[in-house]
C-alpha cells in the first residue's frame, strides 16, 4: 500500500509513504486512524490520479463547465457610473470590478440563472444579474445600485472594499447551492462562482527523517499578498511559495514515523482560477495604518512559476480591473476602480464619474485589489470584437443624455431604482448579514497548513495566514451604529453630508470636478483580536 487519503471538512489530505521506518505495521497509518473517516472516501484509487485535472471527480457537479456561456454578450463600450448614496464608494468600486469580469458578466447577461431560480427574493445572483444588466446597457448614465446589494453589510459608514467584495462573492456562491445543509463541502467547490474565481492550494510537507510526504489541498477564492518586503507582485508571490524549513521548536510531528522531526514545507497552487483576485495587504490589522508604498504589477502576469507543476509552459493572465484606495489609513479615504471594457479601452470608475484612462495611468496606482483573467479566457469572451463587430462608442447622443455640471437628472428612467419588495431586503438581511458572514469566516477559518499571511498565536512564529478578516471582535465598541444602517434610495437632492462623499456625474471627458475630502468624516478602527 503506497498511499492513503483523507477528506477533512472541505480539505483534501494525502499521505505518501515512500519509506516506512516503524516496525509496527500499523504505525505508519496512526495519523489516519486517529481521524474519523467518512463511510466512503470521496476519492478512490482510480480517481486520485486525476486529481490535478479535476479536484471533484465524484462530487456532484452543481454547475457543469459546459453551462458557462461560450458566446460574448457584453456591449463593447463602457457602461454606467454609480451614484454614491453616502459613504458607499467601497460598494461602487467593488461592483464595477465585478461588472467587468467577463465570464461573470456574460453569465449574468444570459439570464440563465434567473430563468431557473426559485428563490428570486434574497438571491444575490438575481440581484447581481439585474445590476450588471442595467450597468452595461446604460452607457453615459448614472444609476443607483440596488439597496439589496448591500443589505446586511452597509452601516451608513465606509467599510473595507475587499471585505465587501468577498462578502458579495460568497453570497453569490451560496446562491448557487440548492440547499446549504444538503450539499457536501467539496460539491460547493463546483459552483459557477468557484469555477470562475476558485482554485486549490497545495501544501506539501516532507519529513526529512522517514521521507514521508503529506499533501493537503484547500480551495481559495482570492489570494492575499504580503507587500512589506516586496517591491512587486511577482516578488510577493515568490515569497508566498518560498520553501520553508521546519526544525527545532518548529519541528514537524510526522504522522508516518510518529516523531517530531525536521521537515520541509512548500505551498504552491495546484490549480489556478480563471479569474485571479490578488489582494495586496496594505492595512495593518491592529492600527489600520496603510502601507502607502508603490508595488509594481504587470499588465500580463505569468503564474506558472507558482504552480505545483511549474514546467508545463506559460500560464499568462491579463489585467482587467484594479481597485484603488486613496488615503493614508483605513479610517478614511476614498475607493475607486479602473476597468477594461471589452473594446480594450481602460476607464476610471469613480462613483458617478466615468473617464477614459490609459494603461500607463492604470499601472501607476497604489492598488489594493488586482483582477487578472487568463489570457485565453479574455480572448474567448471578447471574440465578437476581434471578429470585426464595430464597438459602440459614447458619442454626442450619449453626451446629451447624461447629466452635466453637477445636476442629477433624477427623472431619467435609468436613474430610477427598481421597486424593491420590502421583504426582499428583510430576507437578504436575515440570510446574509455582515456579522453573520464574519462569524462564518471565523468558523471556517483556514487550516494552519495554509496560514501564510500572518502569525497565529497557537502556531510557530514563522507560520502565516492566507486571509483573515480585519473585523473579528469589538465591532460595536469601536464602530457604534449610525442612524442610517442601510442604503437609502432617495429621490431628492443629496444632503450636504452625502454630497461630501458623492461622485459627480458620468463624463467620459472628465469635465466634472469631484468634491474634496471624501469619506474623511466617517472614521473607523480596524482591530483584530487573537
Curated annotation (Swiss-Prot):
Query: Catalytic center at which residues?
Result: 89 (nucleophile), 334 (proton acceptor)
Report whether Transmembrane shows up as a keyword of the record. no
Q: Which residues form the signal peptide?
A: none
User: Can you say where in the cell this protein is located?
Assistant: Nucleus; Endoplasmic reticulum
* Residues covered by region (Disordered): 382-412, 477-530
Q: What is its EC number?
A: 3.4.19.12
Q: Which InterPro entries match?
A: HABP4_PAIRBP1-bd, Papain-like_cys_pep_sf, Peptidase_C19, Peptidase_C19_UCH, USP_CS, USP_dom
Broad enzyme group: hydrolase
Limits of the USP domain: 80-375
TM segment ranges = none
Q: Where is the composition biased (Polar residues)?
A: 496-505
Q: Which UniProt keywords apply?
A: Endoplasmic reticulum, Hydrolase, Nucleus, Protease, Thiol protease, Ubl conjugation pathway
Cysteines joined through disulfide linkages: none
Which residues fall in a compositionally biased region of kind Low complexity?
Answer: 484-495
Bias (Basic residues): 510-524
Main function: Deubiquitinating enzyme that removes conjugated ubiquitin from specific proteins to regulate different cellular processes that may include cell proliferation, progression through the cell cycle, apoptosis, cell migration, and the cellular response to viral infection.
Q: Do you know which PANTHER family this protein is assigned to?
A: INACTIVE UBIQUITIN CARBOXYL-TERMINAL HYDROLASE 17-LIKE PROTEIN 4-RELATED (PTHR24006:SF651), UBIQUITIN CARBOXYL-TERMINAL HYDROLASE (PTHR24006)
Which family, according to UniProt? Answer: Belongs to the peptidase C19 family. USP17 subfamily.
Protein's UniProt name: Ubiquitin carboxyl-terminal hydrolase 17-like protein 12
Q: What taxonomic ancestry is recorded?
A: Eukaryota, Metazoa, Chordata, Craniata, Vertebrata
